[in-house]
Amino acid sequence: MKPRIAYRPLHGILLLDKPAGLSSNNALQAARRLLRAEKGGHTGSLDPLATGLLPLCFGEATKIAGLLLGSAKAYDAEIVLGVTTDTDDADGEPLRERAVPDVSEADLQVALAAFIGRIQQQAPIYSALKQGGEPLYAKARRGEVIDAPVREVEVQAIEVLGYSAPRLTLRVTCGSGTYIRSLARDLGEVLGCGAHIASLRRLWVEPFRAPQMITLEGLATALEAGAEAQTVLLPIEAGLADFARIVLDAALAARFRMGQRLRDAAFPTGQVAVFGPDGSPSGLGLVDADGRLSPQRLFNGLNEISVC
């Protein structure tokens, strides 16, 4: 019988390089077991086929996981033209094969231009979006007819990295909720031949533009060699880099952590990250036009429990 894992309070962010073939939740649980972290969450699913950056939040850092979910992201996608699948990627069953037309790079640029900016995009039927309280993929696996939702998403940029028919490689920078599988599927229809994702790698997630990622194997090796968790975890404040910053003195920081509102005309308006005099994050707040700072998410126990 295997000994039970002794989990511990642990606060920080792990920039995991997710392997292909593993769901985001399974990747999270594997990292959580290795770190022996009591509480963890990821910041938005990567498809099992996809690799690359999956920020994992542990302990008090889970309170900002939803904020990272809404961040901009970038991907490298290899697309195969001429074949559609039921999942819109290589993990699915082929549905239809069509001849790939003679497409020049200029033709590609014209076609891709329609997908840049704010666009309406229909989610894949094999997705984690819920309908009637159930993920779409569960309905799809039962063979149910699904009317996947159409949502507005934003694509900031698409760069052609390479094209040799039938394979096309793109770099896509996009906002939250964008499905690269849907983009590939829809591009294939515009070109008249269909398409699916062959491989997908997430390069970065705001604010981690140049992430030093670690694999599960690398994490296991480092911990077995005696590395402390703080050498592989980023502090919570690393995830707050895009927020306006307010530093309070000890008395005001204590009041803020107790949930009290504060007022100062010098406070920047909007959502802010609040820090104590020692530089440790106290939480997130919202400042209105009158300079009133209202606590939104408070970080607890960071001074009492170190990342170790």
UniProtKB/Swiss-Prot annotation:
Under the heading InterPro entries, the entry gives: PsdUridine_synth_cat_dom_sf, PsdUridine_synth_N, PUA-like_sf, PUA_sf, tRNA_psdUridine_synth_TruB, tRNA_sdUridine_synth_fam1_C, TruB_C
Q: What is the catalytic activity of this protein? A: uridine(55) in tRNA = pseudouridine(55) in tRNA
* Source species, domain of life: Bacteria
The Enzyme Commission number assigned here is: 5.4.99.25
Q: Which GO terms describe its biological process?
A: mRNA pseudouridine synthesis; tRNA pseudouridine synthesis
Mind telling me which Pfam families this protein's record contains? TruB-C_2, TruB_C_2, TruB_N
What this protein is reported to do is described as: Responsible for synthesis of pseudouridine from uracil-55 in the psi GC loop of transfer RNAs.
Identify this protein by name: tRNA pseudouridine synthase B
Organism per entry: Xanthomonas oryzae pv. oryzae (strain KACC10331 / KXO85)
